[in-house]
Amino acid sequence: TPLHHLLLSEKLDTLVMTSANFSEEPICIDNDEALERLSDLADYFLLHNRDIYLRSDDSVVMEMSNTIRPIRRSRGYAPRPIFLKKSGPSILAVGGELKNVVALSKGEKVFLSQHIGDLENLEAYEFFQMTIDHIQRIFEIEPELIVHDLHPEYLSTKWAKDQSLPLFGVQHHHAHLASCMAENNLDEPVIGIIMDGTGYGTDGTIWGGEFLVGDASGFERMAHFEPMPLPGGEAAIKSPWRIGLSYLYQVFGDNLPAIPALENHDIQPIVQMLEARINSPL
């Protein structure tokens, strides 16, 4: 744009570009919203009289072996479809809790939405619902089925269960396997090594680190990391030292060795949680 041309012509040492939003919140799309929400973040605002109709965050790509690989498929890509080998029913897939994207299929085409983000606040959840309404309207597709993550506490899963359509739950790490298969145009069974974090398992425990054998329609869990208590649940994921302490507790019990890296953490309440198995899901 002309604005980019002016900025680059200044020959500044560094230019940092970022979206107009706080972390985990949708980007602002009008002047009043930006001035209200970002007044403590930015010193100056360059405003425009052309309103933005629909949020679409930056796409993120990586160059690998002289090929551009999308890491986050959003502005400039969405809602261009990806193509399936076989035609199927119209399906709405509502994604997971983090880095959410929704998809709507018709025939051999799957229309992916722009990046929505983490569904951890009201603004993001409202954007999630608005995006679903938008893609259904512009493509004039009425889904016959909703596909959701198995995790019962994900907001996307709860939204799906509130609708009056048939549901199909997909295990989180199987979804990763199927996604990689689709990206590489594969049909035959594959070995999937999924080193992902939280994935609600078919056995009701939290999976993480899976060796799966299967295809897009099903899988067998051949090997995995041993389930470990996560003291504090989601808090353990955000504070990995809790997971380290959980491993130490499984080995040493109450006779924990002195670990310099844990000296600045209050470990006793966490040990008590592990002992009593309080708020420490597997």
Predicted regions mapped to residue ranges:
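Acidic, glycine-enriched active-site microenvironments
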Residues: T1-L282
